[in-house]
Amino acid sequence: MIIKKPENFNEQIEQFGKCLEKFNKIHSITNYNDLSAVIEDSLEGLKFITEMPKVAIDIGSGAGFPAIFLAMVLPYTKWHLFEPNTKKAAFLTYAKVNLKLKNIIIHNTKIENETPFIADLITSRAVMKVPDLIKISHGFFDTHTKFLFYKGSNVKDELGNLKAEIFENNMRKYALLKGNDVC
């Protein structure tokens, strides 16, 4: 899917950087200093999605990578960010408000504690192994859902017998799974 960045993307990125720096000084939620690499990594995953999702879930959203950047470039997608850590959820809310991202809902809980709903896309970045991600997202996907997991070098070992397409960019491996392959 070819995505066009919104006109105010650079301003939003600058504002996000300020939010992260300010919040991080007090709460130490991440150790990333180079946002450009994180942004590129976050957006790279969209190259492997062929249809525009209406509803998306990000599991373990942390400091907002990749979810905040994906929400910026997919403004018509309703994003549900699940983050059980209260400090990190507070940061996500702070960033959402400052960036005026009306397409984001923050859930300060584990996904498995939420009432299920079906998403078109489920993302996660380095939270846990792929089978565990699928297990905890049970009830949130159907045969049409796509899973886009931002993984590292052990992704093939994690997948086991699960069917997935793996795309590589530098050190990152993106695992794309289809709901009909995991249902």
Swiss-Prot record:
Q: Which residues bind S-adenosyl-L-methionine?
A: G60, F65, I111, E112, R125
Which cellular component, as a GO term, is one annotated location?
A: cytosol
State whether keyword S-adenosyl-L-methionine applies. Answer: yes
Q: Which InterPro entries match?
A: rRNA_ssu_MeTfrase_G, SAM-dependent_MTases_sf
| Database matches in Pfam families | GidB
The principal localisation class reads: cytoplasm
Keyword S-adenosyl-L-methionine among record annotations: yes
Keywords of this entry: Cytoplasm, Methyltransferase, rRNA processing, S-adenosyl-L-methionine, Transferase
What EC number(s) does this enzyme carry?
A: 2.1.1.170
Name the reaction it catalyses: guanosine(527) in 16S rRNA + S-adenosyl-L-methionine = N(7)-methylguanosine(527) in 16S rRNA + S-adenosyl-L-homocysteine
Q: What does this protein do?
A: Specifically methylates the N7 position of guanine in position 527 of 16S rRNA.
Q: Which NCBIfam families match?
A: rsmG_gidB
Q: What is this protein called?
A: Ribosomal RNA small subunit methyltransferase G
Tell me the organism. Campylobacter hominis (strain ATCC BAA-381 / DSM 21671 / CCUG 45161 / LMG 19568 / NCTC 13146 / CH001A)
